[in-house]
Amino acid sequence: MKRSGRFITLLIGAIVIACFSGRALAADDKAAKPADLVLTGDAVCTSCHDASDDATPTLANRHPSVMAIGKTRHGTRADGRTPSCTSCHGESDQHRKTRGNTKPDVLFSKQGATPVEARNAACLSCHKEGNRIGWHTSTHGLQDLSCSSCHSVHAQRDKVREKQTQAEVCFACHKEQRNQISKASHHPVVEGKMTCSSCHNVHGDNPKMLVKASTNETCFTCHMEKRGPFVHNHQPVTEDCGICHQPHGTTIPNLLKARAPFLCQDCHSHDSHPGQAAALPNAPSNSTSMLGTVARGCLNCHTNIHGGNSTVNSATAGRFRR
Ligand code: HEC
Ligand code: HEC
Ligand code: HEC
Ligand code: HEC
Ligand code: HEC
Ligand code: HEC
Ligand code: HEC
Ligand code: HEC
Ligand code: HEC
Ligand code: HEC
């Protein structure tokens, strides 16, 4: 990588000199057989496309420096599998013959006429394995996203694969998640400690494109202690963490969708609470809504809301108390 970086610096230098020294050099160039500039076999394209393309970026907000591809994994000359220009853009015979007056076979920009399937097929010819196995039936695949909706292959830094910048790429299309993740209680994505892809495989066909087959399995990859096994399970917890938590962010601490007692009273009775006795406040009626207004409410007593292991007292053990 370093070597190709230096190579490009030299190359740019050479071009600058070539420009200044004018026609004499241009004549020499014509005589010489074009050499590969970045990748083995790329001379068919780099005889015309060289670092001078960089001065006129074609994509409004990405500025692909065409030759910067030499500094990416796609520029590793030592690797026999490395693509050349034609592996992605096609042989483009017509384009070459007409000296750029017709389009290359595969053009990745949205304005280009190449259908999405053909653009993606160019990448998938080498990358259909691993994470991408489910691409065609993934939500993104079915929505006709192209690989280059997210990836910038010519840029030295591919924003979507860097922790600090990935979310920006997603937010271009996912405004609602931008809003959620910047709420007071959130997973540390904007802080750069984790990324959207910590939970999502955006090439995959799992539900909600999660990295695992279910929400719970995804959460357990980091919050193992919530998996149990517990002696007493709380049914909504084993069912779906998302019943109580909004994984991106909320205004309520602990990413909760609502505060106790309201959170609990979605399912548990508003107007009765058993064993209303000495330990419990003296309420006019045996009402959980009365209990809920006491201090921190339900969670003051039902502390092990994700599941309890207590075997001390069979009457309280199943109630997620210590
Ligand atoms: C004989 C010169 C020549 C050769 C050889 C050549 N091109 Fe081009 N190419 C051009 C010109 C001229 C343009 C139009 C100006 C521009 O957009 O930079 C162009 C434009 C392009 C574009 C942008 C098209 C658009 O509409 O945005 C791509 C992509 C491209 N060429 C890829 C390639 C590839 C890949 C090869 C090798 C297979 C290749 N070119 C070989 C001259 C050439
Ligand atoms: C790994 C696949 C791949 C390889 C290899 C590749 N390109 Fe590209 N090229 C793309 C994609 C994708 C874009 C769209 C912009 C981006 O993602 O950076 C693009 C954009 C371009 C553009 C700008 C026009 C546009 O559509 O935005 C030119 C010119 C170009 N490539 C020429 C080349 C040349 C010359 C080579 C060989 C040195 C080459 N490409 C190698 C995938 C590739
Ligand atoms: C001719 C084969 C080939 C084609 C076509 C190809 N790639 Fe690659 N790609 C590779 C190789 C080889 C590597 C480096 C080894 C690896 O990571 O597996 C790579 C690596 C990558 C990486 C990871 C880079 C890293 O730093 O780890 C991404 C992302 C990628 N390619 C995206 C694309 C996209 C998007 C396209 C289409 C525009 C594309 N590739 C087309 C062969 C190809
Ligand atoms: C919605 C945005 C998005 C789209 C669309 C997308 N990718 Fe990715 N890609 C990512 C992100 C994020 C990563 C890094 C995290 C990961 O590996 O899941 C990545 C990683 C990769 C890697 C390197 C990871 C590895 O396994 O080594 C390759 C290769 C790749 N993508 C190829 C593709 C191809 C091919 C397509 C089109 C079929 C595509 N991507 C479409 C966002 C995207
Ligand atoms: C070019 C636009 C675009 C970009 C960029 C993009 N997405 Fe999407 N994404 C979509 C569309 C379109 C859908 C389907 C409709 C919807 O749910 O909004 C979708 C759906 C999703 C879904 C829901 C999946 C499901 O099965 O319901 C997730 C999760 C997702 N995207 C994550 C991401 C992540 C993470 C990134 C960044 C790495 C990203 N997206 C980048 C367009 C995009
Ligand atoms: C902590 C794990 C986690 C992180 C980090 C995360 N997500 Fe999600 N995301 C989920 C889960 C779980 C769901 C499914 C929620 C559900 O079932 O309603 C989801 C759903 C989605 C959906 C579909 C929403 C819908 O209503 O169908 C989109 C789009 C999405 N996420 C985008 C993103 C983006 C963009 C990022 C990064 C800014 C991101 N996610 C980060 C876990 C996560
Ligand atoms: C990639 C690792 C990872 C995954 C996967 C993950 N989390 Fe987290 N989670 C974290 C980190 C890191 C924190 C922040 C801890 C801190 O700030 O001390 C956190 C914090 C939390 C918090 C406490 C927030 C607060 O305000 O302190 C809750 C609740 C939570 N996660 C729920 C979930 C749920 C539900 C899922 C599954 C949808 C999930 N997490 C998936 C890493 C992860
Ligand atoms: C019945 C609602 C509910 C469900 C379902 C639920 N949680 Fe929670 N979770 C809570 C409440 C309430 C808190 C706050 C606890 C407190 O304040 O003592 C919390 C706090 C957390 C915390 C941060 C504090 C801690 O205990 O580490 C994490 C992490 C967490 N939950 C993960 C999960 C995971 C993972 C799942 C799915 C396996 C899940 N939760 C399912 C209600 C729920
Ligand atoms: C999505 C619905 C739902 C939510 C929200 C919910 N629970 Fe539950 N909870 C249940 C179900 C279902 C059971 C099992 C009932 C049974 O076994 O009779 C249960 C059981 C319990 C039990 C044990 C009951 C017993 O008979 O052993 C307690 C205590 C409890 N929940 C407290 C809470 C608290 C406190 C909250 C709020 C933080 C809460 N629950 C939120 C559905 C929910
Ligand atoms: C002051 C402590 C305390 C508070 C506050 C409290 N509980 Fe309880 N809860 C208990 C005890 C103790 C039991 C076991 C009583 C028994 O089995 O006789 C119990 C039992 C339960 C049960 C099991 C009901 C059954 O039929 O067996 C549920 C459900 C429950 N509580 C939900 C809640 C909810 C929801 C809240 C908040 C609105 C709440 N509790 C607030 C102490 C408390």
Task: Give a label for each model feature.
Residues M1-F7:
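Positively charged n-region of N-terminal signal peptides that target proteins for export
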Residues T9-C19:
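Bacterial N-terminal signal peptides
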